[in-house]
C-alpha cells in the first residue's frame, strides 16, 4: 500500500447549481408619495439618490419599476421590508418579485 495503509480517496463531484434569481418590482399607486418611494429605494435597496429617482420615475410613468435582482431569500426579505415599512407609514405601496 503506497499511501501508508490509508484507503484510496474517492473524488465525488457535486453538482453546483446557480441559485434561482428574482427581480423585485415596485408598483405605482395613487397614494404613495414619490419621496417615500425614493426613500425605500435608498434604504432598502441601497440605491444612490440618482438611481432611486430614476427607478421612482419609471414606477410613476410606466406603472412598475425594477429595484434589483436577488436570490430568493434576499428578494423575499426585501419585499417584506417594503410592505412592513409602507404599512407602518400608511401607504398601500405594492412590491412583488418574479423569477428571472
Curated annotation (Swiss-Prot):
<dbReference type="InterPro" id="IPR014719">
    <property type="entry name" value="Ribosomal_bL12_C/ClpS-like"/>
</dbReference>
<comment type="similarity">
    <text>Belongs to the ClpS family.</text>
</comment>
<protein>
    <recommendedName>
        <fullName>ATP-dependent Clp protease adapter protein ClpS</fullName>
    </recommendedName>
</protein>
<dbReference type="Pfam" id="PF02617">
    <property type="entry name" value="ClpS"/>
</dbReference>
<dbReference type="GO" id="GO:0006508">
    <property type="term" value="P:proteolysis"/>
</dbReference>
<dbReference type="InterPro" id="IPR022935">
    <property type="entry name" value="ClpS"/>
</dbReference>
<dbReference type="InterPro" id="IPR003769">
    <property type="entry name" value="ClpS_core"/>
</dbReference>
<dbReference type="GO" id="GO:0030163">
    <property type="term" value="P:protein catabolic process"/>
</dbReference>
<comment type="function">
    <text>Involved in the modulation of the specificity of the ClpAP-mediated ATP-dependent protein degradation.</text>
</comment>
<comment type="subunit">
    <text>Binds to the N-terminal domain of the chaperone ClpA.</text>
</comment>
Amino acid at each position: 500500500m503506497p499511501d501508508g495503509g490509508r484507503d484510496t480517496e474517492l473524488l465525488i463531484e457535486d453538482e453546483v447549481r446557480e441559485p434561482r434569481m428574482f427581480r423585485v418590482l415596485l408598483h405605482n399607486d395613487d397614494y404613495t408619495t414619490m419621496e417615500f418611494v425614493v426613500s425605500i429605494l435608498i434604504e432598502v435597496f441601497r440605491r444612490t439618490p440618482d438611481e432611486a429617482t430614476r427607478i421612482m420615475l419609471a414606477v410613476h410613468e410606466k406603472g412598475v419599476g425594477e429595484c434589483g435582482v436577488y436570490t430568493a431569500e434576499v428578494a423575499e426579505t426585501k419585499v417584506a421590508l417594503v410592505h412592513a415599512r409602507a404599512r407602518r407609514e400608511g401607504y398601500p405601496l405594492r412590491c412583488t418579485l418574479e423569477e428571472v
